[in-house]
């Protein structure tokens, strides 16, 4: 299946198909593809073809595949020096596109921390083929001419310069631009939930206006002083000339007078120029101030109009719901009525006339510092060396036997949503401070662990002898991870840097899991789960989100790996885009859209899953997912059909004679009797609508457990306060934690700056339980579990854990 590259997005190719024949080195595992207009198979797709033809892939040699006679493109025009348009550097480089075209010459422009490329210099005026942000990118030198730029997610550029000198010039310029971009990013980023970007822009604009005004005043003062001192000098010289002095002195005075006259003429010209500039600056300053005030007034009017439209839209929706019958599967519901919970209050308006109050169950209290044996500083700052007594051990045993089945009900807090969300349009939400009113009492690490809710699908897959059948269960597991999102419209807490979460279900379910927040900017979490039933799941996910006014887009970046121990089958896939609709008015509802390609890197088997976006005008079932399981030759063996919130079925495909294409359902209708239900969603617990629509697993995730690391999400105080319904205290505690994280970051930056000044080495922040290295399969830089957490837990040795709470 050809992995074509869209604008600025690079599609990784499998690149793990064994190369029979006498081919040279295989291609890099991460596909380099061209940008928009360079569509074609990524470097990993045609591995077998390249090997048969005998041509090495774009490795160190940089030769395009296509047979022994292929040659690299002519390396005549490498990167030029600094170009125009304010760019730090621009020039020609060779970029790997695909196995058919190999390396192609592209015009690259490095400016403002962004590396963009075009097919030609003339194309800069209208079409950019791709852009990568260096602030989050990694630059790797392969050999004398080749280097790689990757952001660890969907973008990877394999580049080649015309010479080693040219390559070094580009790499140096890129490293400098990256350092500057990272510094600017750090200056504007004070915490995971930092001050509003719009407020920062406003402050910067006001500061600029004040500076300009001050400079204009200085210019006016200098103008007056030059005129004053010039006149005084001329007068003094005239008086000196009129005095009776010897002839020789008179000659000297005449020379000085001539020079003073030249100075007067020159200074008068400068004074006139300054006066003209001053008048022009004052005129334009007034125009700018008027324009700025006009834009402010327009913004206020636009906000008022948008708010009015939102209210009208809300009234229309309510009137429509009251006058008509909703379809069988509206976007705010999931599945059939028999297993659907009663809907919660989804209308995000300020009206509270329909508030409902419930009797909340008892508050969950958390023992302090039990089970933590630290060699260094303790969480509270005082040394604590508490061992588990017999009574506490008994309590833990009881906790293991009985998992909690409920949490305190969600309180009804009034909130002026519009006052917060109107400033978020087009922004990255991880940079905007949000009250806990928008949250659910779980962290992103715990949400990531929820992917294991249907772990039994991987247990079944591990027992499959047929790799294609195994792929069906892996696909069902992939879809099942979205079933918990159908009602979950609240956001999880952003983890603090170094925060962890463990889930030890080795005795009950045969698996255990550990997550860690490994990066603060961009926010990234690493996850590793292992099962005694024969599988390992690992991933590093970066979450980016944009608020578009009516909806919120959440785009997870990163690759998920699943390895089966007995067969060595190694599967990878990426997540789709999640969209939250009706942010301002109406009932919040969530949709998943996009495609997932699951690849078995050992056999070459693939599964393509399509998440169909919801449409009011479509007659198709809501939340539909379709899929095909194919062998390396592209032949379809199984078709998948279902919904991401309810269930997934598969059936064998009996292709028509000589026909391999067409729709999977049309080809497989003959084998309807072979349909097998792979997965079905578990019903939600009773009263789930009052408990954030948590599943049975989610209800247990924040239950306090002894012996965990002091950085565990269960010990996060603002999250615990929110779960117990004390939201005002939770907001105050959240601000304290963010300020503490901010101070820690500034301390690390100061230490790094001092080390740079002293010329001493300084190690950047490193994750505690994960190591950043190149993935052997995808060749991406990612965090892989180092294998020490459970040993430290057994010893209760948490001395290396940072104090983050």
From Swiss-Prot:
Residues given in the record as 20-hydroxycholesterol binding sites: 312
UniProt topology in membrane: Peripheral membrane protein
Motif FFAT in this chain: 356-362
Domain PH: 86-179
Residues modified to Phosphothreonine: 375
UniProt biased composition (Polar residues): 376-386
GO molecular function terms noted in the UniProt entry: phosphatidylinositol-4-phosphate binding; protein domain specific binding; sterol transfer activity
Principal location class: cytoplasm
Chain positions found as Phosphoserine: 188, 191, 196, 236, 238, 336, 343, 349, 377, 380, 383-384, 387
Ranges of compositional bias, category Basic and acidic residues: 713-764
Any GO BP: ceramide transport
Binding site for 7beta-hydroxycholesterol: 312
Record's function text: Lipid transporter involved in lipid countertransport between the Golgi complex and membranes of the endoplasmic reticulum: specifically exchanges sterol with phosphatidylinositol 4-phosphate (PI4P), delivering sterol to the Golgi in exchange for PI4P, which is degraded by the SAC1/SACM1L phosphatase in the endoplasmic reticulum. Binds cholesterol and a range of oxysterols including 25-hydroxycholesterol. Cholesterol binding promotes the formation of a complex with PP2A and a tyrosine phosphatase which dephosphorylates ERK1/2, whereas 25-hydroxycholesterol causes its disassembly.
Free-text comment on this protein's domains from its UniProt entry: The FFAT motif is required for interaction with VATA and proper localization of the protein.
Annotated protein name in UniProt: Oxysterol-binding protein 1
Annotated organism of origin: Mus musculus (Mouse)
